[in-house]
């Protein structure tokens, strides 16, 4: 269907170009020859220069700064979202409303397609603050009338640094028996699939890295990266539940949002279709040196 519509001459707007994933997507789109318009809060934070790359400053939380930003654009890609709430902004302010601002502007300018980066299993995790905003945005995008693709990645390699931080001390702590599995993905591999989504007709894509690993196996990789003896401490789940109750009761959503997400996904299988060729073991070894 899309072969006759999409080409490297298409104009792509990327929102969130200076984030971890956004940098890899920018590089991939430029490499593929697309005419790329990268939207950033601060131009100084993006170093890539290319003839087919234009850098624009805008505040996606302020719709007045987005006026005409989608003019002559064919596809919008948004990685906009926050892990930790800051600047007084909530998940609803950023993950939801900022992307609504982009969708509305894109629709007004006749953009053909909107690609949104969400999170794996977000549909099952709507009760979590982070996922509530992302899923509400997904619902809004689906009802917008625009062609769309929602990409749901597993955790990034960079999210696995908690394992490394523990391994550096000589012990890794896990909730439960450590047998639950996940396949985190490198930003470079995910960027490749995001670029592919421009030209296919998939509406939703679940995606993870090439290696499906148990939490025990990830802990072992982290300990080996630091050449430490394998020492994994398995904590009973009541400790996790108590900690989760405590942060929800005694801290603000600003503080507990990322903690409740981490603690909830730690007791879930987070398995996604395998993609890419970057290995978590290599990432850990590089980080540990």
Descriptions of predicted regions:
Residues 5, 237-289:
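A hydrophobic C-terminal alpha-helical subdomain
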Residues 13, 43-101, 105-108, 121-123:
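NAD(P)H-binding glycine-rich loop region in Rossmannoid oxidoreductase-like domains
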Residues 82, 86-168:
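Glycine-/Pro-rich loop/turn segments that contact NAD(P) or position catalytic residues
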Residues 158-165, 196-205, 228-230:
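Glycine/proline-rich active-site loop of Rossmann-fold NAD(P)-dependent oxidoreductases
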Residues 176-197, 203:
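Substrate-positioning beta->alpha
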């Amino acid at each position: 269907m899309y072969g006759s519509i999409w080409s490297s001459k298409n104009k792509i707007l990327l929102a969130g170009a200076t984030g971890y994933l956004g940098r890899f997507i920018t590089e991939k789109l430029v490499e593929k020859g697309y005419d790329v318009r990268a939207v950033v809060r601060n131009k100084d934070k993006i170093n890539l220069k290319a003839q087919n790359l234009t850098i624009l400053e805008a505040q996606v939380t302020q719709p007045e700064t987005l006026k005409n930003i989608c003019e002559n654009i064919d596809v919008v890609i948004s990685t906009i979202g926050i892990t930790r709430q800051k600047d007084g902004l909530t998940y609803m302010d950023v993950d939801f409303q900022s992307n609504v601002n982009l969708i509305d502007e894109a629709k007004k300018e006749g953009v053909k397609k909107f690609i949104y980066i969400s999170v794996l299993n977000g549909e099952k995790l709507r009760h979590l603050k982070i996922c509530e905003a992302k899923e509400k945005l997904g619902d809004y995008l689906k009802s917008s009338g625009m062609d769309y693709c929602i990409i749901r990645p597993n955790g990034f390699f960079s999210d696995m640094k908690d394992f490394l931080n523990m391994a550096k001390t000589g012990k890794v702590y896990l909730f439960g028996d450590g047998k639950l599995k996940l396949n985190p993905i490198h930003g470079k591999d995910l960027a490749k699939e995001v670029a592919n989504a421009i030209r296919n007709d998939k509406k939703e894509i679940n995606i993870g890295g090439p290696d499906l690993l148990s939490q025990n196996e990830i802990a072992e990789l982290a300990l080996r990266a630091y050449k430490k003896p394998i020492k994994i401490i398995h904590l009973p789940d009541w400790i996790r539940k108590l900690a989760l109750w405590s942060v929800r009761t005694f801290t603000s959503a600003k503080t507990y949002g990322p903690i409740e997400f981490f603690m909830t996904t730690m007791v879930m299988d987070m398995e996604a279709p395998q993609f890419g060729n970057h290995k978590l073991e290599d990432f850990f070894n590089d980080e540990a040196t």
